[in-house]
Amino acid sequence: MLVGGCAHRESQYTPSGKHFTTDVMNRMTPVKDQGESETCWIYAMLATIETEHLSWGDSVNLSPYYIEKMIEQEANCPKTKRGEPTTLINMIEKYGICGYDAMRKPETPAPKWVFMLGAQYTPQEFARSVCKPGDYIALMSDDSKPYYETSELEVPDNWTHELYLNIPMDSLLDRTERSVSAHHGVCWEDKNHAMAIVGLAHDEDGEQYFIMKNSWGDSGPYGGLEYVSYQMFRSETIAVEMTKEAYSN
């Protein structure tokens, strides 16, 4: 499977000329801008983790630049720094994470300590407070593979060889919708891009949409949000990530 670039470009997700009514809107941190980088997977998965914590009442805003810098140490990381949202989970467990205020620009040195609520943590210690090993499950829907078994997602960006649970598309859409309705963070990806799902909506014709938080800045008519129809979800989704708790509910 060939995978295109996810750098900032004109959106092909939100249909024009539609009026959207919000049905569910989950809490989220401000929309960020990945610029010309190919690191949408970092932004999308961090945004998913942030929304998950905000739904608990926690305040967390994480730095994508920390992970961008850390993956330079990975021998298998491509020069483009492309990856999968599951790669982000793997890298957080290995290198930790820091808050956005500690590293707001790519040229900022990676901090050795994270200060939170008067306490001092290593980035790895802080990471375990925002994303414990085994918290998340990766899902895909590939009718050429057995359902309810795990296998690698066969795309070049999966350079850490993460495993995904393969389920039917109807089940994938249903579990995604239920998770968003229950205020969980969900990460979505197609063959070109990844975004965090933060809400649900419908248009004047009754067609249903997932509201997605993009990482191309807050310009545009919806302040950096995209409206992805259920029809597009069915045809374009290659994978979804959510907590195991969200999946089991």
Predicted regions: what is each one?
Residues 11-26:
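N-terminal regions that are enriched for targeting/export leaders
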Residues 7-11, 29, 113-249:
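Active-site signature of cysteine proteases
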Residues 39-42, 63-70, 88-91, 99-101, ...:
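Structural recognition of the beta-strand scaffold that forms the well-ordered cores
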Residues 34-49, 78-90, 193-194:
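Active-site nucleophilic cysteine motif
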Residues 59-120:
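Papain-like cysteine protease catalytic cores
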Residues 26-38, 74-80, 158-166:
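Second-shell loop/turn segments in exported
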Residues 7-10, 27-55, 70:
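Cross-family signature of deubiquitinases and ubiquitin-like deconjugating cysteine proteases
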